C-alpha cells in the first residue's frame, strides 16, 4: 500500500521534511515513488509547500496519508478539497 508520509532531511537540529509517496513497507528515509511537498517546522513560521495536483492524484489512486501528513493536509485545505471531489 502506498502511503503519503514525511521523510526527514536536513541537519541534526534543523529538521526539514519531504512529503513523499512511498511503499508502506519501505524505511522512513528509504526509497520513495514521488515527492509531493515539503515541510519546514523549525522556521519561525512553519513553511509548507504542496503539489496539490499530485497529492489529489495519489489520494484518488488509494494512497493513505499518515496522521501527521493528514493534519498538514487539513490545515492547508487539501483534505476538504479531496472529500468534496469524492462526493461528486
Swiss-Prot record:
Oxidoreductase among keywords: no
Residue runs in coiled coils: none
Gene Ontology CC: one annotated term: cytoplasm
Any single biological process term in GO: translation
Keyword Ribosomal protein: yes
Keywords from the UniProt entry: Ribonucleoprotein, Ribosomal protein
Superkingdom: Bacteria
Family recorded in the similarity comment: Belongs to the bacterial ribosomal protein bS16 family.
Protein name according to UniProt: Small ribosomal subunit protein bS16
Organism (species): Leptospira borgpetersenii serovar Hardjo-bovis (strain JB197)
Lineage of the organism: Bacteria, Pseudomonadati, Spirochaetota, Spirochaetia, Leptospirales
Amino acid at each position: 500500500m502506498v502511503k503519503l508520509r514525511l521523510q526527514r532531511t536536513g541537519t541534526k537540529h534543523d529538521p526539514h521534511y519531504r512529503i513523499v509517496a512511498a511503499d508502506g513497507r519501505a524505511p522512513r528515509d528509504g526509497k520513495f515513488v514521488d515527492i509531493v511537498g515539503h515541510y519546514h517546522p523549525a522556521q519561525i513560521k512553519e513553511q509548507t509547500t504542496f503539489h496539490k495536483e499530485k497529492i489529489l492524484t495519489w489520494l484518488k489512486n488509494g494512497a493513505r496519508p499518515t496522521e501527521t501528513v493528514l493534519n498538514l493536509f487539513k490545515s492547508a485545505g487539501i483534505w476538504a478539497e479531496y472529500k468534496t471531489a469524492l462526493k461528486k
